Amino acid sequence: MKPQELFKRMTHHDVKPTRLPREAVRPPAVASILQVRKGGWLKAGLLSAVMLAALVPAPPVMAQGRLDAQYEASLAGILVGRGAWRIDITEDQYAAAAQGGSSGIMKAFSGGSGSGSAAGKVVNGQLQPSGYTATTSTSRKSETIRITLAGGVIKDSSITPEPPPDNDRIPITEAHRRGVVDPMTGSMMRVSGTGDLMSAEVCRTATAIFDGRMRYDLKFDFKRMENVKAEKGYRGPALVCAVYFTPISGYIADRAAIKYLMAQRDMEVWLVPIPGTRVLVPFKMKIPTPLGNAVLEATQFVAAATPRAASKGP
């Protein structure tokens, strides 16, 4: 089965779309958090509706795994959004999809909808993305980002409708388009070897992401262990990793939000494993903003190993 077919089958489950402010519904990764425009820090805070994570080399995935998760986003303790994330990992391919919606007070101020997806192959244990799409809509406009990749190289990317040229953005070079992953794939941390998935060393890594607009690096470091508990599903230990952001290109250097996030030393992500794999994903994330902490946390986190396909006889 092709990755695109896997994604299509995966998203035919009963996950109801909801509405979320355009800036809050981009798929998982810090890149979306950094795309702060004229809406200022309120939009930056709402971007807690997306995930953080890292990407590191890994051995072959030893089994198949699946995640069905529901998240709530808050800003300064006030509920602003809800979202869903689904991941399927088989022995030779993977697919992931996310969607979200505004809740509580945010419905009175801003409405929108958004979804994102990524698919690719599992090659030597590494998730190699082949395609990524993110669509966001509000009452005023809609936007779709598409990225095509092969072997960690961006082969094509587009934003529809095409944004006007901005000479203030640092140009993205061909070198910046190599050795990267898309934001959705970048939300899954792969752990090499056969050792403990929940060791401090797992946090000590870095990754390079291109989100269609911006190329940036994320560096992670170990902070502590905590126990977490979802209303449904996972309860157990989580790795809490510090997250440090370095923009590379595709950004406006004098933007206040970019400078703020570059200086941040208190961004954190809580990582937990998907059974049957050596993949960890975010259970919770926290991003300080001048309006208070932007927090995304799982309320449902149902992850399980899935059976291998039966081997065919001779």
What are these regions (language model features)?
Residues 63-151, 196-314:
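Acidic, serine/threonine-rich low-complexity disordered tracts
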Residues 179-196:
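A structural motif
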Residues 50-51, 61:
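Cleavable N-terminal signal peptides
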Residues 137, 141-183:
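Internal, conserved structured core segments that host functional sites
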Residues 1-3:
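Positively charged n-region of N-terminal signal peptides that target proteins for export
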Residues 5-6, 13-18, 23-48:
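Bacterial N-terminal signal peptides that target proteins for export
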